[in-house]
Amino acid sequence: MRHRKSGRKLNRSSSHRSALFRNMAKSLLTYGKIRTTEAKAKELRGVVEPLITLALRNDLHARRQAYKVLGSHQLVKRLFDEIGPKFVGVPGGYTRVLKLGAPRPGDNAPMAVIELTRLGDAEAAAKEAPAKEVAEEKAAKPAKKAAPKKAEKEEAEDAAEA
């Protein structure tokens, strides 16, 4: 019986499961967003959120604990220097799981996207700024070509009637 046992087994041995989540955590912290099954995404939250909490502590022992999970000095440096400061003052909820509409074609597994909440906001703001500049440039240019086209059509119709 499964009394008081937390977490999903995902049809894997414990070592396979821990390796899976370690690799997925590395990918999520590297890319900021990954696409996976719903169950894996929900379980991955339990691995990544404590890592970000460690990054908020920002001391030597926290770095060593993060290295124990991630196994990469570069990724630990990124976690503590880039990702951690974006979540200062946030009391949890560092990741977001968005369910995708279409299941995976091969086995019909429900899919989801897991992403870091603050990194997505920063990327969206960076994308919106250039988009606004382009919109302003388009608004500044007058539409000169619309009027001549109508005049050309009328002239063509007059020529066809004559």
UniProtKB/Swiss-Prot annotation:
Coiled coil start-end: none
InterPro entries cross-referenced by the UniProt entry: Ribosomal_bL17, Ribosomal_bL17_sf
Region of interest: Disordered: 125-162
TM regions (residue ranges): none
Pfam families: Ribosomal_L17
Signal peptide (from-to): none
A GO biological-process term: translation
Entry keyword annotation includes Glycoprotein: no
Keyword Ribosomal protein: yes
GO CC terms: cytosolic large ribosomal subunit
Bias type Basic and acidic residues, positions: 125-140
Gene Ontology MF term list: structural constituent of ribosome
Key words, A-Z: Ribonucleoprotein, Ribosomal protein
Similarity comment: Belongs to the bacterial ribosomal protein bL17 family.
Subunit and partners: Part of the 50S ribosomal subunit. Contacts protein L32.
Name the UniProt record assigns to this protein: Large ribosomal subunit protein bL17
Organism this protein belongs to: Oleidesulfovibrio alaskensis (strain ATCC BAA-1058 / DSM 17464 / G20)
